[in-house]
C-alpha cells in the first residue's frame, strides 16, 4: 500500500512538472512565433495605404512599449481577448475604445506563460510611460497615481487640467493600480468604476488587466494610465520616452 501511494505521488509530481514546463516554456515558444506572425502582418498592413474597414479577431493593429521594462519590451497588440487572441499577444477588449480616443483603451495580457507580456505590471509606478504606436501616431500614456499623495504624483506628469480631474474631478476614484475580482467589468468602462458611455469630453485612458497573484487567476490586477500626448508619426521620429531607454 505504501509503495502504491508512493508511485501515485511520483506520477502526480511528474504530471505537475510536465504541465508547468508546458505552461512556462512551450507556450512561450508558441506565443512568440504567433506574435512575430501578427507583427509581420501588421507591418504589411501599415505599408499598405488602403484603410481597412474592420479588424479581425487576433489581428495586430498597434504596438506597445513600456520603457521602464527596457528597450526590448515591445508587443504587438491584437484585437480580442479570447484564449487564441491572447496566445498571440496582449489583446484589446473589443467593446472599448481605440488608442488615443476619448474613453478607455483596455488591453488584457498573460502574466505567466503564453509570452507573459504583463508579467511585471506590478513593478510599474505612478507616471511611468506606456507608449502605443499605431499606423499614424505615437500615443504616450502615463500611469495614474498609486500612493497617498495623489496630487503630487499626478502633477509630476499630467497637465494642470488633468491633475484637477484626477484629484478632485471625475477621475478622482480611478487608481493607477488596483486588485479586484474577475467579474469587475466596470474597470474597463470609459471612466472606470462608472457606467458612463464614451464622450468626446472624456480623457483618453489606457487600462491593462492581468491575472493576480502570479500563477493564479483568482483575482485581476488592473492598471490605469492617462494619455498625455499624441505625436504624429513622421520619418525618423521616435518619442523621447523611447530614445532615453
Summary of predicted features, one role per range:
Residues 3-4, 9-245:
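Solvent-exposed, non-transmembrane regions of membrane-associated and secreted proteins
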